[in-house]
Amino acid sequence: MSSETFEFQAEISQLLSLIINTVYSNKEIFLRELISNASDALDKIRYQSLSDPTKLDTGKDLRIDIIPDKENKTLTIRDTGIGMTKADLINNLGTIARSGTKQFMEALSAGADISMIGQFGVGFYSAYLVADRVTVVSKNNDDEQYIWESAAGGTFTLTQDTEGEQLGRGTKIILHLKDEQTDYLNESRIKEVVRKHSEFISYPIYLHVLKETEKEVPDEEAEETKEEEDEEKKAKIEEVDDEEEEEKKKKKKTKTVKESKIEEEELNKTKPIWTRNPADITQEEYASFYKSLSNDWEDHLAVKHFSVEGQLEFRAILYVPKRAPFDLFETKKTKNNIKLYVRRVFITDDATDLIPEWLGFIKGVVDSEDLPLNLSRETLQQNKIMKVIKKNIVKKTLELFNEIAEDREQFDKFYSAFSKNIKLGIHEDAQNRQTLAKLLRYQSTKSGDEATSLADYVTRMPEHQKQIYYITGESIKAVAKSPFLDSLKQKNFEVLFLVDPIDEYAFTQLKEFDGKKLVDITKDFELEETEEEKAEREKEEKEYENLAKSLKNILGDKVEKVVVSHKLVGSPCAIRTGQFGWSANMERIMKAQALRDTSMSSYMSSKKTFEISPKSSIIKELKKKVEADGENDRTVKSITQLLFETSLLVSGFTIEEPASFAERIHKLVSLGLNIDEEAETTEEKATEEAAPAEATTGESAMEEVD
């Protein structure tokens, strides 16, 4: 048959070049990847056969075979899985890059380990770590048998296979090993790698071993010589006793010959680890199973092995990885972290209803005794048993998180990797919100560089503090210097720093912790005060009432209201938002979303309250100025505008007209440096002939800032 030649997709070509031309120490992972792919192919055909048993007519024995051939320097990995059609071979092995191809190359360039390859969905190409040429023979029930072949030189060929050994169904990958990689043809080396990486694959893995046995066979030549000697003796001996005749028969001469034969040795006889008693399983066995399940090269962070009995029976092993996967929040990607078995028979790894999205990083196995074997994905979603299993998985996972929290070092690793998931859980899972809230950690005005839990925060609350306070912003540096903190620090009230974009979403849903309301101090709120403080506040509000009205008239629609604030201490003013709209931080986040709903933006955008502090010397002087010259004075307007714009920045908002703001600042700088604009160059004068002469007094210069 004639061959067709195809070019590899550009990113795949780059990946192959990287794999071939870089020296990697742990090349052995190629075998793990190919066995893992074979196991996936077997999973698929077994799943299909549950609804259509005739799918297995082309081969009922589901298995993986490893066949070393020292003479031809090839290593073959064969499975009786679903096989690939011609289109599958073209798409899956060359012309369509998977989403992880580019990310994996970036990770490699950044110094990541080659053993991560399976996590990015491109494990097949690890074959080129040890082989200079790879041949793939594959037969799917819906197509003819085809041969895919490539030496990774930018192209691959595809040929219909009519003459070779017919597989019936499945895939055979033949690795033509590099001269320096023939170690992988040795029985002991193959066993070592399989035991290390693939011991817990749920299909039998058979190694084809060439065994030489010694066998005793009759020595024909010796027998002929003996017969001649016997003929000579016959003339001399008259009779032969019957017993002696019998003895002669017994003493027939034999010789030892060596006989070669291929034996199949099963390498993974261990029964499914989740069916065993947890007390009998070592940490090494859990780690080995985790790696075979997840394609991770690192050990897991924590594991939970449990069984549920009663009206519903199932066993499960759940793992928390050490790191978040690169595509953790990629919504289009199928999550296949939990493998669902029914009575030890694999059903699917795409049971989206088995675990909530916010727990998408958990990996593991669930084996149910109660689900029917012939479940379709559609009926899985409606199945009541699945809902009960999901509830139990979430419950046990939360128990596992609390166990991790008991070890400070382990919890720091966990929180660094998966804090966003915890917060997403608080946002989405109303039932477990309060339990998850106990896992939150934040820096605060009292925690220093350490992070504090909400429970620890509550223990430090002064007796007269009734609420938990927090501030949202872009960074710790930004919020730590916020004017909103002043009055709370003065009262010895601790404030939590929320600087992750998802924090505000989570706290909006959480609303309270331990019976105490969560309060965003960038929004309007009631601050606890004594009777003396209340009397002083009311007095100051009355005293500065007219100034507040004047400033509102100057600022117009830019603010909803101007109020005299007792919540500011060192700062002259700040901008706070209403309780029910977006905070400054949320407005910034929403503006950054390209596909946001603009109608929602106008509805939810912050209703700004301009707060002025009667204790500030700037506000005191501004009050005098307004009383003396009125609110229409140019200097008053300029100062008010400048105070408003600086408050926007300090409070976390953006300025709508940054150029005008910059111009005002530049004029202030000129004033501070006593720059006389009349002394400017002749050129500048010519362009500004119409401009009024600059006054030299501070007041007239300030008028020009407008």
Swiss-Prot record:
GO terms for biological process: cellular response to heat; protein folding; protein stabilization. ATP binds at N37, D79, F124, R377. Molecular chaperone that promotes the maturation, structural maintenance and proper regulation of specific target proteins involved for instance in cell cycle control and signal transduction. Undergoes a functional cycle that is linked to its ATPase activity. This cycle probably induces conformational changes in the client proteins, thereby causing their activation. Interacts dynamically with various co-chaperones that modulate its substrate recognition, ATPase cycle and chaperone function. A motif (TPR repeat-binding) lies at residues 702-706. Pfam families: HATPase_c_3, HSP90. One of its GO terms (molecular function) is unfolded protein binding. It is found in: Cytoplasm. GO terms for cellular component: cell septum; cytosol; fungal-type cell wall; perinuclear region of cytoplasm; plasma membrane; protein-containing complex. Belongs to the heat shock protein 90 family. This is Heat shock protein 90. The keyword Cytoplasm applies. Residues 214-261, 679-706 are annotated as: Disordered. Residues 689-700 have a biased composition (Low complexity). PROSITE patterns: HSP90. Homodimer. Residues 217-231 have a biased composition (Acidic residues). Keywords: Allergen, ATP-binding, Chaperone, Cytoplasm, Nucleotide-binding, Stress response. The TPR repeat-binding motif mediates interaction with TPR repeat-containing proteins.
